[in-house]
Amino acid sequence: MEGSDNTNTHCWICKDEYNVSTNFCNCKNEFKIVHKNCLEEWINFSHNTKCKICNGKYNIKKNKKSCLRWKCSFMYCNVPAICVSLICLLLLPLTILLVKFNLKSMLENIENRDLIALISAMAYSLPCVVGFITVVHILIALYDYYLAAKSDNTTYQVYEYI
């Protein structure tokens, strides 16, 4: 290192020279020297609003984009689970129709009316239960996707302590 003083004048993130003394947390010595842009990128990547060295909380402001300006990514999406759920939803009406026609012809031969009512109720309710569970699963997957996208579309702006 050139120069006569022993102080480290390099940003601890990008290692470029930095001559301005800013105070974003309680760190001393070389960890105190950091570019504002480098620190903001670091915080936006890690989503950690506290310094890992001194545990001091950064003076930050959250900037949330409006939902219409979000950048969405399929990397948060559980694609196999959503595909299985959509296939179940597509097969649901077909299953109900098959149950209806096959059950009707099968039950015409049975004389006990109470047994017929019980079998009918079970046969019709099972596809409905599967459909309900599938819809709930899709809603949960969409909510998880929303939370991940919301987190990814929030940026932090750091300010110096005064």
From Swiss-Prot:
PROSITE patterns listed in its UniProt record: ZF_RING_CH
| Gene3D superfamilies per record | Zinc/RING finger domain, C3HC4 (zinc finger)
Q: Which GO terms describe its biological process?
A: symbiont-mediated perturbation of host ubiquitin-like protein modification; symbiont-mediated suppression of host antigen processing and presentation of peptide antigen via MHC class I
Q: Where does Zn(2+) 2 bind?
A: C25, C27, C51, C54
Q: Which domain of life is it from?
A: Viruses
- A molecular function (GO) term: zinc ion binding
Positions annotated to bind Zn(2+) 1:
C11, C14, H35, C38
Broadest EC class? transferase
> Which SMART domains does the entry link to?
RINGv
Catalysis performed (reactions): S-ubiquitinyl-[E2 ubiquitin-conjugating enzyme]-L-cysteine + [acceptor protein]-L-lysine = [E2 ubiquitin-conjugating enzyme]-L-cysteine + N(6)-ubiquitinyl-[acceptor protein]-L-lysine
Report one GO cellular component: membrane
Which Pfam family is an annotated match for this chain, by its short name?
A: RINGv
Q: List the disulfide bonds.
A: none
- Note the zinc finger regions (RING-CH-type) by start and end residue: 3-61
Query: Coiled-coil annotation: which residues?
Result: none
EC number(s) per UniProt? 2.3.2.27
Q: How does it sit in the membrane?
A: Multi-pass membrane protein
Parts of the chain on the Cytoplasmic side: 1-78, 143-162
Segments on the Lumenal side according to the record's topology features:
100-121
Function recorded in the entry:
E3 ubiquitin-protein ligase which promotes ubiquitination and subsequent degradation of host MHC-I and CD4 molecules, presumably to prevent lysis of infected cells by cytotoxic T-lymphocytes and NK cell. Binds target molecules through transmembrane interaction. The result of this ubiquitination is the enhancement of the endocytosis of the target chain and the delivery to the lysosome, where it is proteolytically destroyed.
Family listed:
Belongs to the poxviridae LAP protein family.
Q: What is known of its domains?
A: The RING-CH-type zinc finger domain is required for E3 ligase activity.
Can you say what this protein is called?
A: E3 ubiquitin-protein ligase LAP
Q: Which gene encodes it?
A: LW010
